[in-house]
Each structure stands twice: as structure tokens, then as C-alpha cells.
């Protein structure tokens, strides 16, 4: 018998990291330089989700570039939010659109671009990009 840990059964308590991921939401704080245009580049190299058709895991690097307005995103919250996709059945295209929509709702940036660079599967490599510009910008 192996000594490797196994997933908890319903009777076992949920691990603290799993609780943090389940509660994961995008949190913001005031932009320290409102009124100044500057770019924030964030790379999330360990993104995972599940294929909605096969159930196989998908892996990607998510690139997030934005120009903040009045708020910036807290990085630990962003990490937990992204980790919440791990067991979710979602297409590559929908991943990028959901992340973009949630990011815009939380941070209301002047401009934002989300790029999902998904690892090749079956000799096919896919990159999905979506953008948003704040109205009136």
C-alpha cells in the first residue's frame, strides 16, 4: 500500500488551501497612482482546467496586461482565483472570456488584455486573446 496522500473523502475535512481556492475571488486595492497611465504585466504559468469534452486536463500560461484606473488587483487573490479553474470543465475560449469579464468587473481597468497560451494537445497549439477598453477612454 502506498503512503501517498489521497483526496479527502466527504467525511474528511477540506484542506486549508482547498478552502482558500474555493473562496477565491478577485480583490482590489486603490491605485497608488491614479491619473497616470502605466502598464501592469502579470504572468500565470501554472493555469489548469479540464476539457469540457474529454475531461482531460488542459494546461496554459495566462498573460494579463492592464492599465489600471482607480483600482489594482491583489496578486494573492488573483492566484487563488486562477487556481479555482483547476477542476472546472471549460473550453480554452471561455477561460479567456470568463477571466476577462471577472477582471473587468472587479478592477474596472482603463484597458486590459488577457491571453491564454494553451499547451499543445494532439499536435495542436492554441492561443486565445481578448481585450477590453473602458468606455470613454
Curated annotation (Swiss-Prot):
GO BP terms = queuosine biosynthetic process; tRNA modification
Per its UniProt record, what InterPro entries does this chain match? GTP-CH-I_C/QueF (IPR043133), NADPH_dep_7-cyano-7-deazaG_red (IPR050084), QueF (IPR029500), QueF_type1 (IPR016856)
Catalytic activity field:
7-aminomethyl-7-carbaguanine + 2 NADP(+) = 7-cyano-7-deazaguanine + 2 NADPH + 3 H(+)
As recorded in UniProt, its EC number(s) are 1.7.1.13
Q: Does the keyword Oxidoreductase apply?
A: yes
Q: What is its main location?
A: cytoplasm
A Gene Ontology molecular function term for this protein is: preQ1 synthase activity
* One cellular component (GO) term of this entry: cytosol
Q: Which residues form the active site?
A: 51, 58
Residues annotated for substrate binding in this entry: 73-75, 92-93
Whether Oxidoreductase counts among this entry's keywords is yes
Q: What does the UniProt entry say about where the protein is found?
A: Cytoplasm
What does the similarity note say? Belongs to the GTP cyclohydrolase I family. QueF type 1 subfamily.
Q: What does this protein do?
A: Catalyzes the NADPH-dependent reduction of 7-cyano-7-deazaguanine (preQ0) to 7-aminomethyl-7-deazaguanine (preQ1).
Q: What is this protein called?
A: NADPH-dependent 7-cyano-7-deazaguanine reductase
What organism does the record attribute this protein to? Gloeobacter violaceus (strain ATCC 29082 / PCC 7421)
Amino acid at each position: 500500500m502506498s503512503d501517498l496522500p489521497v483526496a479527502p473523502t466527504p467525511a474528511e475535512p477540506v484542506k486549508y488551501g482547498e478552502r482558500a481556492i474555493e473562496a477565491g475571488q478577485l480583490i482590489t486595492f486603490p491605485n497608488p497612482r491614479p491619473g497616470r497611465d502605466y502598464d501592469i504585466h502579470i504572468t500565470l504559468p501554472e493555469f489548469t482546467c479540464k476539457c469540457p469534452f474529454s475531461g482531460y486536463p488542459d494546461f496554459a500560461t495566462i498573460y494579463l496586461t492592464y492599465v489600471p484606473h482607480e483600482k489594482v488587483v491583489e496578486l494573492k487573490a488573483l492566484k487563488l482565483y486562477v487556481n479555482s479553474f483547476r477542476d472546472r470543465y471549460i473550453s480554452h475560449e471561455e477561460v479567456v472570456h470568463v477571466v476577462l469579464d471577472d477582471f473587468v468587473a472587479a478592477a474596472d481597468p482603463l484597458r486590459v488584455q488577457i491571453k491564454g497560451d494553451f499547451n499543445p494537445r494532439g499536435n495542436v497549439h492554441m492561443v486565445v486573446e481578448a481585450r477590453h477598453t473602458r468606455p470613454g477612454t
